[in-house]
Amino acid sequence: MTMQAVADAVGVRAPSLYKRLDGRSALIRAIADDVARELGGATAPALELEDPGEAIRALAGHYRGFAHRSPGAYQLLFSNLLPEASPSAEANAAAAAGLLQLTERLVRRERSLQAARLLTAFAHGFVSMELAGAFRLGGDVDEAYGFGIDAIIEGLRISGAER
């Protein structure tokens, strides 16, 4: 990706990009921040759902759908090939805020980060394998994803009951 290619794609001259961004690294960071915020913005409708399990299911479905609609943008978030491709701390915090609120409904507040990491690790691992075509044993992949999310929600509910 070059500044010239981006300028051409958005219909401006490359020098005008440099007025807004401090080079290619800043451009990539801005894209990563935008992707993180877009993914995090999906929590808003889920937060309106009363049942936390349903809310997490809705969020997990959006997460997976986003990865399928925008695999390049999705992979950018989790790549360590370019340090500048990591979203800023502010964008990461904004992206995670809704998920943390949802997990706090199921577990003690001090465990919500661990619960959010568990959900993210499962969803990311599953989606990454799915995008790579790694599920080769047959069966319904949609059903498998739902089963995994449901199992995690049930485990979190049990853990949360120990408050």
Q: Would you name each region that the model predicts?
A:
Residues 5-8, 17:
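Append "Primarily bacterial transcriptional regulators
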Residues 84-118, 142-154:
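Amphipathic alpha-helical packing segments from all-alpha helical-bundle domains
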Residues 11, 20-44, 57, 61, ...:
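An amphipathic alpha-helix adjacent to DNA-recognition modules
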Residues 38, 42, 66, 102, ...:
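Short alpha-helical functional segments enriched in proximate histidine and acidic residues
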Residues 68-86, 128-136:
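Amphipathic alpha-helical segments used for helix-helix packing
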Residues 121-138, 154-162:
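Amphipathic C-terminal alpha-helical segment
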Residues 44-73, 93, 116-119:
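Hydrophobic alpha-helical connector segments
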